[in-house]
Amino acid sequence: MNRLGRLPLPLPPSVCLFCQSRATTPLPPSLQATRSMATARLRRRVARMTLSPDVAKPSVVKKTRGDKERFGPFAGMNQTEARIRDKPRTRSRAAQKRSGEPEEDSQKESPLYKALKMQTALAPIPYGRRAAIKAKIADITSFDQFQLLPVVRNSISSQALPGLVDVTPTPIQRLAIPRLLEEPKTEKKPTKADDDEPQYDQYLLAAETGSGKTLAYLLPVVDAVKREEARDKELEKKEQEEKAREREEKLKNRAFDIEPEIPPLSNAGRPRAIILVPTSELVAQVGVKVKALSHTVKYRSGMISSNLTPRRIKNTLFHPDGIDILVATPHLLASIAKTEPYVLSRVSHLVLDEADSLLDRSFAPTTTEIISKAAPSLRKLILCSATIPRSLDNLLRKRYPDIKRLTTPNLHAIPRRVQLGVVDIEKDPYRGNRSLACADVIWSIGKAGDAESEGPYASYVAPKTKKILVFVNEREEADEVAQFLRSKGIDAQSLSRDSDARKQEEILAEFTEAPPPPTPDEILLAQKQRRHEDAIPFEMPQKTNQDSSRRLANTKVLVTTDLASRGIDTLAVKTVILYHVPHTTIDFIHRLGRLGRMGKRGRGVVLVGKKDRKDVVKEVREGMFRGQALI
């Protein structure tokens, strides 16, 4: 109370009553959902799961003024163009659409590849550049046009590509072999400013699956190894002559004061070239090709992986006669390099096969460590892959800005000779049973006749066994699907990281080695046996088998994960079934890339369910039909 005995009046509140009541009242659910949807942002896909848009674009960095940079008080001096603040702005696309006017300098976007662009899984290379590359390599039609050593050139048809009548280089081989055979004109002298920059040449080989990338880098590497071996022999001969002269002079001057000779450094465990691959299965496959060329070219090669015993790895790498070309996995080679630092002291050529995997998060630290240790003697770094993700492209532009990019016209495309079919598992008779749909497709393919003729002696040769690959997304489902297929009378096996190493080699051998054509002796024996059966007047007793009607004959199925989707040369496979829709178009390319190799035809089948992206499958199928890159 004041002096007059009255109560003071309350002060007016700083916030009105309407605002106070509005703050205490919660928003209705419909408005809350609207507000949350309005503030939500679309998340960008991970860079390692999306392909780069500018694979063939050179790494040229242009300095541009940032949008947030403000002009100072003296920014108007020495200007050739006036910056008028009230300059009329161009109308936005939304305003033009509302007014019904056509957009300026823009073309109507085709609805094709809409879903793939939303995923940003594949990215384009301009088709003008593709046409220029085609015109550039059109004149190269034979391996004789390459500046290879005669012994290397003669070994291509006999060792690298046996059994082929028409031996012609593929597009990536026409691009890569001449560039990789080039010798550096002048060697770089390291300066203080260029200490961090690599002093070796870098190459990126980007080509579609099954295009012969292995032979594209292997032939120049073998050629360089043989040339370097010849140079070393000449230098060694000169050094021995000089040492002999010095020894004679010392003997004349000081007959009793002779210094002990220093033994030369052994070449054991010091390869000239190293090929790194991500898996032990690829080590075996690439190692066989390297070994085949060594029979005629004469060099020492070896392969090491975790599937081999320590004694065999030691005998292969540290052979007293030395080693020229080594095929290995990064983790095993890095562990050996920690205890034996001289392993990487003589490497002149380093190849990263499946570079998108070797420079991913799991392999990047180990691979980078190997490159840095081999850098003092390294002359050429070669990276090759069928898919170039954005993460790899950004890494190359940052770390190797001067890398030479050799890309083929059909990069990020699936060959047109591969047909893609779609099976909706939600319809009758499957009703959502994906395993039942897979078994039904395999039975249909197994019962159907082979489209390719076996030649004039087809009736005298045993029927060809059909090989089918089934890809699943999860490792645990490989065994489950294989067990279900076996219960339906299908000869199915599973292959994953959980499988035994020896079992993996045996299984892959059945699906990677194509059976050779029948020899004349086999044809004559089959003819003789058939004439003998036709001459018997009565019917021969046949083997009775109760389950013969429930078994699918002449068909073998391999249920696997992405373990067999990269680099495995599955020449014997003509059919691939995608049990699940792949997560990205990168997986689409690698899984369907097991087909159409060496110019052969193939067929792919995708099982599509209720929750799968049917729009992505549709656009991939249309892109394959058009023969375009999956953009």
Swiss-Prot record:
Signal peptide feature range: none
Motif annotated as Q motif, chain positions: 141-174
Catalytic reaction list: ATP + H2O = ADP + phosphate + H(+)
Location of the region described as Disordered in the Swiss-Prot/TrEMBL record: 68-111, 180-199, 229-249
The keyword Mitochondrion belongs to this UniProt entry's keyword annotation: yes
Skewed-composition ranges (Basic and acidic residues): 98-108, 180-193
The keyword ATP-binding belongs to this UniProt entry's keyword annotation: yes
Motif extent (DEAD box): 353-356
Binding-site list for ATP: 207-214
UniProt EC number: 3.6.4.13
Main location: mitochondrion
InterPro entries: DEAD/DEAH_box_helicase_dom (IPR011545), Helicase_ATP-bd (IPR014001), Helicase_C-like (IPR001650), P-loop_NTPase (IPR027417)
Subcellular compartments: Mitochondrion
Record remark on domains: The Q motif is unique to and characteristic of the DEAD box family of RNA helicases and controls ATP binding and hydrolysis.
Family the entry assigns: Belongs to the DEAD box helicase family. MRH4 subfamily.
Protein name: ATP-dependent RNA helicase mrh4, mitochondrial
Organism: Neosartorya fischeri (strain ATCC 1020 / DSM 3700 / CBS 544.65 / FGSC A1164 / JCM 1740 / NRRL 181 / WB 181)
Gene of this entry: mrh4
